């Protein structure tokens, strides 16, 4: 029997980052994980959860307060220059020069990374073709749409042939159709380039579609880490969501097939084994309902299960300091 041994290309151990403002804020709280070579690994959580800070530490842009990590075998504290040569980064905010063409932006990037001229020209053509931007290579970046900019930045991140690609909120602010296109390009580069990818996102569907494994991160801590399929399956059944004024939850708790009950914002969510079979009995027990929904579990249900609140409560706009203030108020 031949065993396939997966090699870890990212090793994170007890990583912590504390920011000192008027009070100390723990942005990343003693997290540890490994990422296998060729894996698409997601850091999923609301804005302010610690995702981008974690990515910034791994990219050697921010120093940790304690703990360490190895990227492609290189220590982020002792060998930062070797780490930087091993990674490509697509930032959350566009960082291309608007006055340069797409081609010129990539050429500048190649020069900075010391890619030889002959190799550089071949790679620029290859990566721009990969993201379907070769025909627009001579246009100034300021003439590109948001999706085109993102595609050029994907190409730029790949130009120096990194072992690991960091994507920080790769589809933030893009319309649904453009998001779909970007997902297709990410899947394409995984297939063709065999590159390891770390994605930060607050989009459930993005993490579900692209990631082999997901670490759900909240208030700087990893609350759970597994494949999207396992995370949803481990909830133990389907989800019945009820909007109800006066729920009779005590009787519902006695039903053996109800695995979990969560009440939030005037709604009750039940995790139920074989939900369709038991729905009518639940409705009789729980009382008069305004609406009912029965569906398979989502990553939002996983987040609710582990944190006690829905993911969309935080929204895309919730800032780090506002979330910390809310957290303290609830303690």
Predicted regions and their residues:
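Walker A (P-loop) phosphate-binding loop of ABC-type ATPase nucleotide-binding domains
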Residues: 46-50
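Conserved ABC ATPase "signature" region
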Residues: 107, 111, 118-136
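Catalytic Walker B motif of ABC-type/P-loop ATPase nucleotide-binding domains
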Residues: 165-168
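Helical segment within the ABC ATPase nucleotide-binding domain
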Residues: 180-193
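Conserved catalytic motifs of ABC-family nucleotide-binding domains
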Residues: 161
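Short, charged/small-residue-rich alpha-helical element at the C-terminal edge
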Residues: 238-310
């Amino acid at each position: 029997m031949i065993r396939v041994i997966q090699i870890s290309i990212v090793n994170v151990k007890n990583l912590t980052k504390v920011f000192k403002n008027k009070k100390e804020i723990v942005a990343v709280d003693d997290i540890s994980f490994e990422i296998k070579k060729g894996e698409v690994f997601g850091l999923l959580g609301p804005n302010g959860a610690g995702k981008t800070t974690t990515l910034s530490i791994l990219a050697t842009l921010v120093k940790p307060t304690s703990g360490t990590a190895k990227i492609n075998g290189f220590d982020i504290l002792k060998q930062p220059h070797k780490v930087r040569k091993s990674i490509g980064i697509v930032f959350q905010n566009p960082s291309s020069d608007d006055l340069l063409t797409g081609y010129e932006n990539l050429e500048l990037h190649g020069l900075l990374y010391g890619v030889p001229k002959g190799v550089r020209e071949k790679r620029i053509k290859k990566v721009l073709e990969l993201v379907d931007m070769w025909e627009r290579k001579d246009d100034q970046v300021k003439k590109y749409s948001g999706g085109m900019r993102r595609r050029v930045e994907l190409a730029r991140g790949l130009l120096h042939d990194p072992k690991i690609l960091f994507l920080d909120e790769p589809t933030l602010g893009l319309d649904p159709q453009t998001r779909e296109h970007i997902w297709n390009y990410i899947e394409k580069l995984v297939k063709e380039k065999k590159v390891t990818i770390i994605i930060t996102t607050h989009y459930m569907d993005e993490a579900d579609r692209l990631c082999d494994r997901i670490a759900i991160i909240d208030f700087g801590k990893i609350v759970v880490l597994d494949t999207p399929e396992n995370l949803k399956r481990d909830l133990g059944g389907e989800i019945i969501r009820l909007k109800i004024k006066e729920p009779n939850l005590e009787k519902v708790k006695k039903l053996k097939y109800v695995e979990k009950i969560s009440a939030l914002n005037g709604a009750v969510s039940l995790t139920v084994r074989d939900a369709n079979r038991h729905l009518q009995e639940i409705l009789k027990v729980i009382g008069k309902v305004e609406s009912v929904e029965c569906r398979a579990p989502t990553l939002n249900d996983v987040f609710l299960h582990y944190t006690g609140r829905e993911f969309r409560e935080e929204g895309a706009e919730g800032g780090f300091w506002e979330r910390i203030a809310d957290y303290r108020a609830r303690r």
